[in-house]
Amino acid sequence: MNWRYFYKPAAIVITIVLFNINCRSSSKATVDSVEYLNKAASSPDTNKIDAKNQPELNTDHSNNTVPLKNMFGINGYEWNFLENPGSPNDRKHIYEDNMALIKTFSGMRHYLNWNRVETTKGNYTFNPTNNGGWNEDLIYQRCKQDGILVLADLKNIPDWLQNTYPASSRDNDNAPVAYGQSLNDPASYADQARMAFQLAARYGYNKNIDKSLIKVDTRKRWNGDIPNEPLVGMGLLKYIECGNERDRWWGGDETHQTAEQYAANMSAFYDGNMGKLGQGVGVKAADPNMQVVMGGLATADVKFVQRMIDWCRTNRGLKADGSVNLCFDVINYHLYSNNGDVRKQKKAATGIAPELSISGEVANQFVKLANSLPGHPEVWVTETGYDINQESYQKAESIGLKTVLANQADWILRTSLLYIRYGVKRVFFYQLFDDHAGGTSQYATSGLAEGIKRRPAADYILQTTRLMGDYSYIKTISNDPLVDQYKLGNKTMYVLTIPDETNRKASYTLDLGGAKKANIHSLKIGADMMDSKHMNTTIGKITLQVTETPVFVEGLN
């Protein structure tokens, strides 16, 4: 990836000066209600946040019922579930030490390599897979048991499809078509769409499927092997993703797809190009209710999605209600907060705090587009995160006395808090473990766990989930410090953060609407729960020191 370097100022401390305000109590969600009257004024800030990267103040989002825990997904692989270092050849059982880590997160984006489940053309295997001997059934069953949503991302192309290309251009990231086929024709993507049908038939919720269309390979690989069993409607998956970063600009020519070509790809994947590709092709042919997620876009370019919509209007037409017959249910992109700009391919030198990046602006663009469409498809961010190795342009740096790991934790949690403000419905961090422990390249050391222990970022996610995972974001009442209000029924929680990366601190007076006490919850590295303490209020108000680590406050009577 190409990023731009630019200067980053040294850390300084800025103080916020408080104004005394007369607050009026009101139950109305209007500007005269108490929660809108929390105010703070600040001295000049060296890291000014552009207005387009700031949330609107006092805009009520109470119709948004997305729980905060939906912002705490993770990316992972089969071996994260099944590979026990004490018994590396046993892939029939969940490795419970790792599962304890995975349960920290609300969702798992599973990188499902197509070659694992269709090692030879037309022969589908799931338990065990012919490639690797993995038990996909067990992984999905355990995730459902533990309340973890799974997004199965069918990605890369299998060896037999690669082998249709000349040796010099074979790449498992090639577009999912045989060599020489048109990338503009949905029929060229029929092989991948057949694979999608088999996945949706097996793991979806529709049990009324013509069994003659199920093509599970039941042959044993050797004597004593456990054969695959053809199953349908197991009720384990609700979401499936078509590829990964198909808008890539790196790699060979065969790895690239335009927006129109990817729309043709998704049209086949979605419903067999409206059924034109025959039986047993496309997700919706197997389970009409399974949600098809667009492959995460590397460029975070909302225009790419608009071009896909335009292709659908031209090639798939309109529904009876006049809306475009889209080939996706969920809009999906990737964005890593740094001081570059992926949209312009400007090179970065370092990761930066999410609020200082383009993340808010980009999220706003995607959500605005989604809300302009009938049905308002959800917007997800399925890759984001920070490295801990200091050679990476995506690194989290140490700030003041705060370690790199502690700062990674702050920025990870603040990333979730940012995206829920803008209406993104789910976030998945990259990734559970380091891709290359000790590596120095970008994305090599982005793991949120290490060995069988959580890193601080995962500590913060677990603690926040336990405190208020079911709460929904209501509004932001201050931009600096950031003060967000969340609710669950008649309970209210405030989250306060300095949106900076200079070790800045501030005092802030929070009006809790007449509450006699405040319960203040502070994140703690290495713990399962936050530290909590009660403090008396003064006429329902409490003055807090706010830092770049979020603090959580609720009123008590």
Regions picked out by a protein language model, each given a short descriptive name:
Residues 2-10:
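Bacterial N-terminal signal peptides that target proteins for export
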Residues 36-228, 232-235, 241-242, 247-253, ...:
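N-terminal substrate-binding region of glycoside hydrolase catalytic domains
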Residues 108, 143, 199, 240, ...:
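Conserved, mostly hydrophobic/aromatic
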Residues 210-226, 258-412, 422:
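Noncatalytic carbohydrate-binding groove/subsite architecture in carbohydrate-active enzymes
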Residues 385-461, 481:
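Aromatic/acidic polysaccharide-binding cleft in carbohydrate-active enzymes
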Residues 477-524:
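Carbohydrate-binding surface patches
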Residues 531-557:
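C-terminal beta-strand-rich structural cap/linker in extracellular carbohydrate-active enzymes
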